[in-house]
Amino acid sequence: MVVAKKSLGQHFLTDESFLDRIVDALPPLNPLKLVEIGVGLGDLTLKLLDRYPLKTYEIDSSLCEKMRSKLKVQKKPFKLELVEKDALFLKEEEPYFLISNLPYYIATRLVLNALKDPKCRGLLVMTQKEVALKFCAKDSQNALSVLAHAIGNATLLFDVPPSAFSPPPKVFSSVFEVIKESLKEKALASLAQVPFFEEALQKGFETLEDFLKACFSSPRKTLSNNLKKSVSYKEKLDKVLDFLALENQPTSVRASEIKDYLKLLNYLLKG
């Protein structure tokens, strides 16, 4: 019997109906490779192997061994490449699509890593509902939603109750997807003055991420007050005020009320 490790944030999805819904929600993948973070008890992995070849990253050696044992008994039409490694260091040489029931404690960081990775063309993941709502929020409600929608289209798909897991978590989970869009990627890459597109895209994403940290540092305060405290952007405050005037927005605007962060950041970087 496998005991969930609290240190790794393990809650295993065991409800067959929700496992099927996740697999059915995958978009057409060809020619993308499918990459999974976390093998868990193998329930989702085995269902995926009925339809796709799969590469899975798993840090827990005992779960890796259990998965290898299962595959000796349950023959699948597609092959599993099981990598015993921390997914924080996930690095693929070819374009891929990410799928995962992410550990709550590290979910945000793993999603941001995938969004930042030019090789990742999209993702379908389950996180704590609160995190999913932040990534999928419309307009500029928070920094995570701005980042997700700056590079693609983020959509909340469905909720998953605690009873679907073993052991059950204390909160609801949600499944959401982010599908990257080439036009948005080009706009992000234009923020960086480097010759190679993938490098420019990653640097552009990091530039926007850094800017948003300053803008949303105190969400209830005005954008101007937040940027005054930023070492990187306080000297550009006059240009921010110029931009707000051009956009017919008041100087008392909050970060969540900015209509177009890429437009604002481009304006700041030009001067």
From Swiss-Prot:
Q: Which UniProt keywords apply?
A: Cytoplasm, Methyltransferase, RNA-binding, rRNA processing, S-adenosyl-L-methionine, Transferase
Name of the protein in its database record: Ribosomal RNA small subunit methyltransferase A
InterPro entries registered for this protein in UniProt = KsgA/Erm, rRNA_Ade_diMease-like_C, rRNA_Ade_Mease_Trfase_CS, rRNA_Ade_methylase_Trfase_N, rRNA_adenine_dimethylase, SAM-dependent_MTases_sf
Binding sites annotated in the UniProt record for S-adenosyl-L-methionine: H11, L13, G38, E58, D86, N101
Q: Which PROSITE patterns match?
A: RRNA_A_DIMETH (PS01131), SAM_RNA_A_N6_MT (PS51689)
Catalysed reaction(s) here are: adenosine(1518)/adenosine(1519) in 16S rRNA + 4 S-adenosyl-L-methionine = N(6)-dimethyladenosine(1518)/N(6)-dimethyladenosine(1519) in 16S rRNA + 4 S-adenosyl-L-homocysteine + 4 H(+)
PANTHER family per record: DIMETHYLADENOSINE TRANSFERASE, DIMETHYLADENOSINE TRANSFERASE-RELATED
List the SUPFAM superfamilies hit by this protein, alphabetically: S-adenosyl-L-methionine-dependent methyltransferases (SSF53335)
Q: Which HAMAP family does this chain map to? A: 16SrRNA_methyltr_A
Q: Which family does it belong to?
A: Belongs to the class I-like SAM-binding methyltransferase superfamily. rRNA adenine N(6)-methyltransferase family. RsmA subfamily.
The subcellular localization recorded is: Cytoplasm
Q: Which Pfam families match?
A: RrnaAD
Q: Which GO terms fall under molecular function for this chain's record?
A: 16S rRNA (adenine(1518)-N(6)/adenine(1519)-N(6))-dimethyltransferase activity; RNA binding
This protein's GO cellular component annotations are: cytosol
Question: What's its top-level EC category?
Answer: transferase
- The record's EC number reads 2.1.1.182
Chain's role = Specifically dimethylates two adjacent adenosines (A1518 and A1519) in the loop of a conserved hairpin near the 3'-end of 16S rRNA in the 30S particle. May play a critical role in biogenesis of 30S subunits.
